[in-house]
C-alpha cells in the first residue's frame, strides 16, 4: 500500500471523526437551545427560577407523585409532584416510573365516580377530577414539557358570575385550603380549570395570591404539555354552610363546620387587601345601607323605602349598587353599617363584612317563602357572626310586576304550554323544588316589587324586638371546658336492697384561667349490661347517689363539665364502680 493511500485513509478517518463530533455538538447545542427555549417558556409563567434540565430529568426518572388527604372523593385534597396537563387532550397526565407514588392507590375505584371534587360543591358530576396514566418512557414521544415552577392550587370556580357563589364556593374554601398547606402562600398560583372566562369578579380572586391566576384557556398558550412541579388539587369544604338543592331542596348543610370567627377573619384579611378600613363610630354615626338593583328583582318604590327607614330610625340611609360602585367602596360602607336592607340576591353575601351587632333585612318577592331560601339567614346565625336576621315577604299580588316574556333564565314562561303558564301565574306559593331550572321559581324570584311600607316596618319592628343586646364579648365566652380531673367513686352497701354511690372530681384545668358565667357538671350512670343510663346535672363537684342504686352491682360512670348551659366538655375516662 502506498504512502498516499495510507494518508488518504487516515484523512478520511479524521474527517469522519470530526464530522461525527460536530454532529454531536450540533445535536447537543440544539438540545441546549431547546431547553433554553423551554426554560424561557416556563419563566413566562413565573419569575421563579427553574433549571429545565433538572426538572425534565426528575420527571423522566421519578415520574409523577401523589399523596392525598381524605377518605372519599368528596373530602379529598391531593398534592402532586410533576403532574402534567396536555392542552390538546384537555386531560391531566400522571407519568408512571419505578419511583412514582400514588396514595391512595384506588385502582379502578378512582372512577367511582372520581378521585376528588374540583370545587367545594359536593359530589356535583360537572366538578369531578381525574387523570390519564402513561409510562414516563412515553415522554420521548411527546412535545417537550413546559414546567410551572410555582406551587399551584388547581380548582374549579363553580359560578364566577354570581357574587354569592364566588364567596361561598370559591374564595372562602380557597382561602382556608391555602391556610391548610403552608406552601400555598401568597406566592402560590391559582389555576382555574372550569373553562369560564375571567368574569365580573375576577379582581376578588386576585386578592388570594400575589400571582395572576391562570385560566384553562390560557394554558394552551404556554405549550402542548405543561407540568406543575408542585400542585394541590381540590378544595376544603369545611367553610361552606349551604347546599343548593341538587339532590334535595336547598337549605343549610346538615353538618356545618364553620363559625363566624373564621368568616370574620377571612373578611378582615380581604378588607386589608382591598385597603378598606372599618370605621369606628359612635351611635351618632349609625346608618342604614340599602342595596339597589338596576335590572332585575327591583324595589320599585325604593325612594319611598329609603325615606321610611330614615324617618323610622332617625338615621342616615345610604344606597349602594354593584353596577355603579367599586366593590371595595361598597365594602367600606357596609363595614360600618348598623343595618343592611336588600332584596333577595347574591349581593347579600356582603353581609359577612357587616360589623358585629348589625341587622340583616332580606326582602322576598310575592309567592317566595323566606323559610325555603336561607343562605343569608344561615350565615347570620353562625356562632360568632353576631348578626340579627329579619325577613319580609310581599303578600300582596297587586304589588308585584312579573315578566313572562323575558328569557327563561330571567323568569320568562312564554315558552311553556299555555296550561302550565296559567298554573304558574295562579300559584300563590312556590313549592319546594330542586335546583336549578324550576320555571315557577324563576318566574317569581325575578319579579319586581312595590314594598308595602306599613307591613315592612311592622315586620322590622317585630324582628328588632327579638334582637339580643349585643355586647363585645371576650374570646373566652365561646371556649369549651377541658376534661374534669381526678374523677373517682366510692360505694357502700346499706342493706340487702340499698346502696350508695359517691362520685367526686376536680374542675377542668383550663377553668381557672377563664371567666365563665355558669359552671355545671353532667354525670351519666349506667348499670353494666344495660343499654340505658341515668343523666344528672349538678352544680357541685361531688354527689352521693342512692336512688336506683342496687347492692352488689357494677356501674359505669361518666362525668363532664358544661359552661354556660351549652358549651360541653369531653367526658372523663369511664369509672367502674362496684357496690
From Swiss-Prot:
**What are the record keywords, sorted?**
Endoplasmic reticulum, Glycoprotein, Glycosyltransferase, Membrane, Signal-anchor, Transferase, Transmembrane, Transmembrane helix
User: At the top level of its lineage, which domain of life is listed?
Assistant: Eukaryota
Which GO terms label this protein's molecular function in UniProt?
Answer: acetylglucosaminyltransferase activity; protein O-acetylglucosaminyltransferase activity
Described purpose of this protein according to its UniProt entry: O-linked mannose beta-1,4-N-acetylglucosaminyltransferase that transfers UDP-N-acetyl-D-glucosamine to the 4-position of the mannose to generate N-acetyl-D-glucosamine-beta-1,4-O-D-mannosylprotein. Involved in the biosynthesis of the phosphorylated O-mannosyl trisaccharide (N-acetylgalactosamine-beta-3-N-acetylglucosamine-beta-4-(phosphate-6-)mannose), a carbohydrate structure present in alpha-dystroglycan (DAG1), which is required for binding laminin G-like domain-containing extracellular proteins with high affinity.
User: Where does it live in the cell?
Assistant: Endoplasmic reticulum membrane
User: Can you tell me which residues are glycosylated?
Assistant: 98, 275, 542
Name the gene behind this protein.
pomgnt2
Q: What class of enzyme is it?
A: transferase
The record's annotation in CDD domains points to: FN3
Q: Does the keyword Glycosyltransferase apply?
A: yes
Query: Organism source for this protein?
Result: Tetraodon nigroviridis (Spotted green pufferfish)
UniProt GO cellular component terms: endoplasmic reticulum; endoplasmic reticulum membrane
Q: Where are the transmembrane segments?
A: 5-25
Pfam families in UniProt = Glyco_transf_61
Q: Which PROSITE patterns match?
A: FN3
- Catalyzed reaction equations: 3-O-(alpha-D-mannosyl)-L-threonyl-[protein] + UDP-N-acetyl-alpha-D-glucosamine = 3-O-(N-acetyl-beta-D-glucosaminyl-(1->4)-alpha-D-mannosyl)-L-threonyl-[protein] + UDP + H(+)
Q: In which pathway does it act?
A: Protein modification; protein glycosylation
Q: Which residues lie on this side of the membrane: Cytoplasmic?
A: 1-4
Query: Which InterPro entries does the record match to this protein?
Result: FN3_dom (IPR003961), FN3_sf (IPR036116), Glyco_transf_61_cat (IPR049625), Glycosyltransferase_61 (IPR007657), Ig-like_fold (IPR013783)
Q: What is this protein called?
A: Protein O-linked-mannose beta-1,4-N-acetylglucosaminyltransferase 2
The record's EC number reads 2.4.1.312
What are the residue boundaries of the Fibronectin type-III domain, all occurrences included?
480-579
GO BP: neuron migration; protein O-linked glycosylation; protein O-linked mannosylation
Amino acid at each position: 500500500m502506498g504512502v498516499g493511500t495510507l494518508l488518504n485513509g487516515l484523512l478520511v478517518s479524521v474527517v469522519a471523526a470530526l464530522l461525527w463530533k460536530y454532529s454531536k455538538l450540533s445535536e447537543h447545542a440544539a438540545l441546549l437551545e431547546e431547553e433554553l427555549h423551554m426554560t424561557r417558556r416556563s419563566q413566562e409563567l413565573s419569575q421563579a427560577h427553574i433549571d429545565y434540565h433538572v426538572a425534565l430529568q426528575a420527571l423522566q426518572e421519578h415520574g409523577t407523585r401523589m399523596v392525598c388527604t381524605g377518605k372519599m372523593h368528596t373530602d379529598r385534597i391531593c398534592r402532586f409532584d410533576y403532574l402534567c396537563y396536555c392542552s390538546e387532550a384537555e386531560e391531566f397526565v400522571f407519568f408512571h416510573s419505578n419511583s412514582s407514588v400514588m396514595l391512595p392507590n384506588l385502582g379502578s375505584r378512582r372512577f367511582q365516580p372520581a378521585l376528588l371534587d374540583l370545587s367545594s360543591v359536593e359530589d356535583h358530576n360537572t366538578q369531578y377530577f381525574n387523570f390519564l396514566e402513561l409510562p414516563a418512557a412515553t415522554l420521548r414521544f411527546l412535545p417537550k414539557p413546559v414546567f410551572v415552577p410555582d406551587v399551584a392550587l388547581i380548582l374549579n370556580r363553580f359560578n364566577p358570575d354570581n357574587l354569592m357563589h364566588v364567596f361561598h364556593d370559591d374564595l372562602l374554601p380557597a382561602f382556608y385550603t391555602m391556610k391548610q398547606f403552608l406552601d400555598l402562600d401568597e406566592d402560590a398560583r391559582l389555576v382555574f380549570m372550569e373553562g369560564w372566562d375571567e368574569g365580573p369578579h375576577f379582581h376578588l380572586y386576585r386578592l388570594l395570591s400575589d400571582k395572576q391566576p391562570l385560566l384553562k384557556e390560557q394554558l394552551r398558550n404556554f405549550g402542548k404539555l405543561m407540568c406543575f412541579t408542585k400542585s394541590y388539587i381540590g378544595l376544603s369544604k369545611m367553610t361552606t354552610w349551604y347546599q343548593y338543592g341538587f339532590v334535595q331542596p336547598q337549605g343549610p348543610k346538615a353538618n356545618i363546620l364553620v363559625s363566624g370567627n373564621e368568616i370574620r377573619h377571612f373578611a378582615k384579611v380581604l378588607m386589608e387587601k382591598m385597603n378598606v378600613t372599618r370605621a369606628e363610630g359612635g351611635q351618632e354615626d349609625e346608618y342604614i345601607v340599602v342595596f339597589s338593583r338596576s335590572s332585575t328583582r327591583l324595589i320599585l318604590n325604593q325612594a319611598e323605602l329609603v325615606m321610611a327607614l330614615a324617618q323610622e330610625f332617625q338615621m342616615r340611609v345610604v344606597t349602594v349598587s354593584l353596577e355603579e360602585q367599586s366593590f371595595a367602596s361598597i365594602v367600606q360602607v357596609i363595614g360600618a353599617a348598623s343595618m343592611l336592607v336588600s332584596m333577595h340576591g347574591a349581593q347579600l353575601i356582603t353581609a359577612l363584612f357587616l360589623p358585629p351587632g348589625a341587622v340583616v333585612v332580606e326582602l322576598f318577592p310575592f309567592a317566595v317563602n323566606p323559610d325555603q331560601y336561607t343562605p343569608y339567614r344561615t350565615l347570620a346565625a353562625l356562632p360568632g357572626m353576631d348578626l340579627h336576621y329579619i325577613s319580609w315577604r310581599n303578600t300582596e299580588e297587586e304589588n308585584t310586576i312579573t315578566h313572562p316574556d323575558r328569557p327563561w333564565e330571567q323568569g320568562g314562561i312564554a315558552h311553556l304550554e299555555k296550561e302550565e303558564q296559567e298554573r304558574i301565574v295562579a300559584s300563590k306559593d312556590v313549592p319546594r323544588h330542586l335546583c336549578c331550572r324550576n320555571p315557577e321559581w324563576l318566574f317569581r324570584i325575578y319579579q319586581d316589587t312595590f314594598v308595602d311600607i306599613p307591613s315592612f316596618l311592622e315586620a322590622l319592628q317585630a324582628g328588632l324586638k327579638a334582637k339580643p343586646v349585643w355586647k363585645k364579648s371576650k374570646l373566652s365566652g365561646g371556649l369549651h371546658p377541658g376534661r374534669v380531673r381526678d374523677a373517682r367513686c366510692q360505694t357502700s352497701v346499706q342493706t340487702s336492697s340499698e346502696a350508695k354511690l359517691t362520685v367526686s372530681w376536680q374542675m377542668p384545668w383550663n377553668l381557672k384561667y377563664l371567666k365563665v358565667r355558669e359552671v355545671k357538671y353532667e354525670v351519666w350512670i349506667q348499670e353494666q349490661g344495660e343499654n340505658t343510663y341515668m343523666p344528672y346535672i349538678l352544680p357541685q363537684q361531688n354527689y352521693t347517689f342512692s336512688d336506683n342504686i342496687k347492692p352488689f352491682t357494677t356501674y359505669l360512670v361518666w362525668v363532664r363539665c358544661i359552661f354556660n348551659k351549652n358549651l360541653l366538655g369531653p367526658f372523663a375516662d369511664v369509672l367502674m364502680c362496684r357496690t
